[in-house]
Amino acid sequence: MEFSQHFQKLIDDMRLDGRYRTFAELERIAGEFPTALWHGPDGQARRVTVWCSNDYLGMGQNAEVLAAMHRSIDLSGAGTGGTRNISGTNRQHVALEAELADLHGKESALIFTSGWISNLAALGTLGKILPECAIFSDALNHNSMIEGIRRSGAERFIFHHNDPVHLDRLLSSVDPARPKIVAFESVYSMDGDIAPIAEICDVAERHGALTYLDEVHAVGLYGPRGGGISDRDGLADRVTIIEGTLAKAFGVMGGYVSGPSLLMDVIRSMSDSFIFTTSICPHLAAGALAAVRHVKAHPDERRRQAENAVRLKVLLQKAGLPVLDTPSHILPVMVGEAHLCRSISEALLARHAIYVQPINYPTVARGQERFRLTPTPFHTTSHMEALVEALLAVGRDLGWAMSRRAA
């Protein structure tokens, strides 16, 4: 059978409706974040300012993190040589898991190769092994959570986004004796809004449900030690399992879950996604360990990052640009049309040396295309002013209707 025509049509259709993804070839420069080298289609390298990185605190460039990674490579080499069960558990893994458990005030933690895998593994395993399990999932949960729930085979109930009343109604419709999990996020990555964690925990506790909180876009950034929104609001002890990433505010790579030792042991012992994969490299674990320890002890980066997020939002609002008024560090600038969003992004890069990736369907709904700006502690006022001026200039040239939209 000839498959090429089918595959070509899929690609052509994606190009036609603006879903086709092109990757900007960027080379990060140690010590110069958020500046990077962009290797353009003409083969030339050009210095650009990055405005959409998930390295929220610049920990990927932090001297302590880099030194820890170099030491680990010199000591242990590159890879682990096995799964966690077969020769692949390194001292760095054990120390990192203990540090993450402490970060969230939990008994235990378990690291994975990515945050996507940690959600897939934890939700997929718990939903599968709990008899007659029902999982209640926020309508805007991340793809990794959706896939984990789907993989579990558990019955899924979708509650309206950040709506404890609807969650309560759905939980009330289920047999009280059934095992139940409520899965939600703290900071939602595309809209930048924050979950009402206390209210959701109130509802879950009334119905005897476990709570599973994805803090991927909050760990490192909120709370006295960077434990996330649950840390900031003093709610970590009310959440059964807290999931996070090592690849955003901590600047390295990997994901994790933290919670009661018994639940972590069950996931460790029964998750295919944990059992049958090579463990993360020792130098990645060492770098993440250094990053977590640094963030716990040094609040300055997250304070400056929060200040810069407010500063940029004010500049965007004053310029009349359609930025959502979010309570978090994520600043969505709404465009509303896929091809226009991509054209603006390309013009910003080519004309103004500013890199902002367009966010189109299926990451967001059609008609909700946007840019997702993520200020860091290292963006300056000059960077911000240049971004606003470039957005206005490119917007005028391309006919972008920039009047502010209600959030």
From Swiss-Prot:
Pathway: Porphyrin-containing compound metabolism; protoporphyrin-IX biosynthesis; 5-aminolevulinate from glycine: step 1/1. This is 5-aminolevulinate synthase 2. GO terms for biological process: protoporphyrinogen IX biosynthetic process. It comes from the Bacteria. It catalyses: succinyl-CoA + glycine + H(+) = 5-aminolevulinate + CO2 + CoA. Substrate binds at R21, S137, T363. The keyword Aminoacyl-tRNA synthetase does not apply. It comes from Cereibacter sphaeroides (strain ATCC 17023 / DSM 158 / JCM 6121 / CCUG 31486 / LMG 2827 / NBRC 12203 / NCIMB 8253 / ATH 2.4.1.). GO terms for molecular function: 5-aminolevulinate synthase activity; pyridoxal phosphate binding. Belongs to the class-II pyridoxal-phosphate-dependent aminotransferase family. Pfam families: Aminotran_1_2. Its EC number is 2.3.1.37. Keywords: Acyltransferase, Heme biosynthesis, Pyridoxal phosphate, Transferase. It is an enzyme of class 2 (transferase). The modification N6-(pyridoxal phosphate)lysine is found at K248. Pyridoxal 5'-phosphate binds at S189, H217, T245, T277, T278. NCBIfam families: 5aminolev_synth (TIGR01821). InterPro entries: 4pyrrol_synth_NH2levulA_synth, Aminotrans_II_pyridoxalP_BS, Aminotransferase_I/II_large, AON_synthase_class-II, PyrdxlP-dep_Trfase, PyrdxlP-dep_Trfase_major, PyrdxlP-dep_Trfase_small. Its cofactor is pyridoxal 5'-phosphate. The active site is at K248. Homodimer. The keyword Signal does not apply.
